[in-house]
Amino acid sequence: MEMLQGLLLLMLLSMGGTWASKEPLRPRCRPINATLAVEKEGCPVCITVNTTICAGYCPTMTRVLQSVLPPLPQVVCTYRDVRFESIWLPGCPRGVDPVVSYAVALSCHCGLCRRSTSDCGGPKDHPLTCDHPQLPGLLFL
């Protein structure tokens, strides 16, 4: 009888999280709001823009016997559908194109990171800040 009670208790405890909330414990991969610093070499200003980026949890696995078997591909939260918007930087000298484009995430998914189009993570040497004086982002095209 004690074994049956223990099994029932284990089942109830393991299902408790599903009753408490329908949301996952970790936020899944999805578009989120973000503020980016936009600047261009040759232009004396930096403008912040509000956009959406892909962020969130993607389930991954790793092998226990890594030396025997090849590594499993690791997935990251990355863009599925994206559009590009442009902003005009004031004060750029003649000969420097003042238009800068940036991505706006429309939808995201868990997939392999494409280094050709994405920052695949890892530690950063410096925070994402401006090198030039900052202006509010008011100059959209």
Swiss-Prot record:
Glycans are attached at N33, N50. The gene is LHB. Residues 1-20 form the signal peptide. Disulfide bonds join C29-C77, C43-C92, C46-C130, C54-C108, C58-C110, C113-C120. SUPFAM superfamilies: Cystine-knot cytokines (SSF57501). SMART domains: GHB (SM00068). It comes from the Eukaryota. This is Lutropin subunit beta. GO terms for cellular component: cytoplasm; extracellular space. GO terms for molecular function: hormone activity. The lineage of its organism: Eukaryota, Metazoa, Chordata, Craniata, Vertebrata. It is found in: Secreted. Its main location: secreted. It comes from Pongo pygmaeus. Promotes spermatogenesis and ovulation by stimulating the testes and ovaries to synthesize steroids. GO terms for biological process: G protein-coupled receptor signaling pathway. Belongs to the glycoprotein hormones subunit beta family. Heterodimer of a common alpha chain and a unique beta chain which confers biological specificity to thyrotropin, lutropin, follitropin and gonadotropin. Keywords: Disulfide bond, Glycoprotein, Hormone, Secreted, Signal.
